[in-house]
Structures are given as C-alpha cells and as structure tokens.
C-alpha cells in the first residue's frame, strides 16, 4: 500500500491486519461476551500473544478463548528499503498456515432467549432457564443489555466508557454476578431441611397471627405476615407463602440439635449441597458465589450469644443470605429432579472433541432424600392452581407449573419481584428463575414473565396475550 511504502519515514510505526468480530444479532450479548486487546501482562507472559492481539474479555469469548482462537499462521516476506513487498522469503519455506478455531455449539434456545430479552426490556434483572435433565442452560438474560457491536472497531473505547458509566450497568451480568436475597423462594429449601432433620412432618401445623405473623422473644419481636386462614400445614404454608410457618419450622429444626452452632453448621451443609455459596464450577469465567455465612461469622458478630431467632430472617430468605439468579435456577432444577442436578453449562459441543467436560455430565446429589421433595412440589403446584396460591395469574391450561413467589426487601427502594418454577410437574422440561429489581410482589412481574417463558418453550406459543402485553408494555426503569 502507499502508506506501507512510506512507513520507513515514521520510525516505530507498522501496518498490521486484524480479524474483527461481527455479531449479526444483538441477542445473548452477556452470554457471548466481547473481545478486547490483550493487556501488557498477558502479552509478556503468554507466548501465544503479542501486543495488539485480541482476546476474549467476557462471556463465551473469554471462557472458551483457547478453543476459539485457533493457531496463528506466519508469512515471512522480503521488503526493500522503502518497505515495498519483494515476495516471499526463500519461496515461503518457513511459512505456516493459520488454523481456524473450533466451532462451538451452545445450549441456548435462541427463540426463547430472544423472547425473554423482549420481556425484560425496560426492566432491570435477570432470567435463567435450565433443562433439569441435562443442566443445559436454555436462556440466560441480564437486563438491561447492550449492542455488542459497540465494542468493536475504532469507537470501542468511547462506547465502552459510555456503557460503563450508565447508571443501569448494562455491562454487568446480573444473571451470574448479581447477588440478591432469594426471599420467600428460599422457604422451599428450609422446608426440605426441616423435613430431612425431623424438625417437622408434612402434617406439622403452625399458627399465624396475620400482621405480626411469627412472634418471639421477651420483647415481643415478630416477623410480619399477611392475613389468611390458620393454622397451616406445610403444603398450605407454601401455597400462600406464610412467613410464620417457615419461621416456626426453622426454630423447630434448630431445637433438634444440642447447640446453635451444631444446628447452623448442619443447616449450612445442607444449603451448600444445593450449589449455594459457591461458583458451582460451571463453564463461565465470571460469576459470584453469593453469600452463605459460616458459623464463625455469627459467632464473631454476636460473641457466641445467638440462636435460631437471632437469624430468623434466614428462614424466609432474607438477612445475610444472598444468591445469584443462576443459583436460584439450579436450586429449582434440583427440586424438579427430586434431589440431583447437572452443573449448569452453556456449551454442549466443541468441534474436534468427542465429549464435553465430564463435570457437566455427572449427576450431583444434594443432601436431602428424594422422598421429601414430593410434599414440597405439591405445595409449589398449589402456588399456581390453589385457591390461595400467590401466583394464580400465572397458571397455564393443561400444564402443571410448580412455582414459588418471592418478594425480597430492598433497602434502596421498591421490593424485588422473584419467581422460581419448573414444568411440567412430572418429567420436567424447564426450570426457571426470574428476578426483577424493584418489581414489587413476586406475582406482579416475575411470575408472569416465568409463565410466558414456560409457555413459549413447552407449547411454542403464548396462550395469555393480555398478560404478554402487560409485561411488554411495562417500564420499571425510571428516567431522570
């Protein structure tokens, strides 16, 4: 080129060809990720890279960088003093051809992914859907999102600055990195643990005083609830999401042990077996373990003077407990499977490789016996079809959806809307978690979104067009 022939006049400059990515669809942005120039440390320490090379920064681009990048080729050329091409050195004897990277096949159902992204427009939160029988991630949505092509080309730095300074954090992958209180969805786990440890049976009843719900201590402290019939059994407690029931069950569970420390250690072990409090060893390089405090945390905080009622908020998924949406979806898949799961993963096939990582094909069991899941699941079904169900508006004709609403307290504004579900009840095809920040009741936003996603995936159509229109028109992002 003309410029190349003149470069000898500009010391330190050279021409270099780069292969640029193009993302033909704006869908699955947080999943796919994006490329960026390698940093100085990587360029110096990794012999594959040189300054100016591109590598994966986030998503699949980063997690499967080695599979995608291929092998570099090399061509040695002769040039004259004016940098003009004089042909190959020794007829290309030392040249090598580049080898293309592997082709990856993802687990994503692209139509479901696109639909979920439409439903989450003008909202902040996440959706994660998993196939329980395989652990394959069917959709993983973080909202708001962004156009990945903004991070390609000359204006990449300028666009990145704008995106990174956006108060709604579109670059932040809430599905993997957002840590939230699970709210009442976590009552299911506490119910399972209480059953396993004989703190309660399916016929154990607890009274609820309505507004004051569960009262405890000499000062008359309480965990509030809402007016409903009382007393309640386990299944009814799930159906109407009674705080008092699960606080009582939590206290009964603790009473089975000789000390608070012993009880909490046992509880912590059970909860951990659901993939909570750890990274789950999936095929993403980014993600957070959430927050599941150990006994030592409370021993230090309360100087050894604490009991079940001190941490009673954990009974209803509040307090120090924080989960990521992918953990909530995996928790739901475990319930759907009656006690086991496959590590959630996003890649199902890599060209040139016969099998995927065995970590993704090996069953992992939680610590709860299979027989204790049925009463929990029966209660979850009543959430959508029962007279007092908290998500009656999300039932679908001829399809048993087992779900649980959650409304998590938010110190920064409106409560968060949560819903976890799987369907159908027997031989489940999909497990899903929906989290809508500042969405209020779980039944208002999260449950309808989950129902629409389930309908789309299983029935391939939408039976409730009015509900769909309500969600599509909903705008929960406040404009300044």
Describe the predicted segments one by one.
Residues 2, 85-126, 270:
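Conserved, well-ordered alpha-helix/loop/beta-strand core segments that scaffold catalytic motifs
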Residues 57, 328, 442-447, 451-455:
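Short, charged, low-complexity patches
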Residues 14-16, 30-34, 105, 126-130, ...:
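Soluble periplasmic/extracytoplasmic beta-strand elements of cell-envelope proteins
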Residues 52-80, 124-152, 267:
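Carboxylate/His-rich catalytic cores and anion/metal-binding grooves
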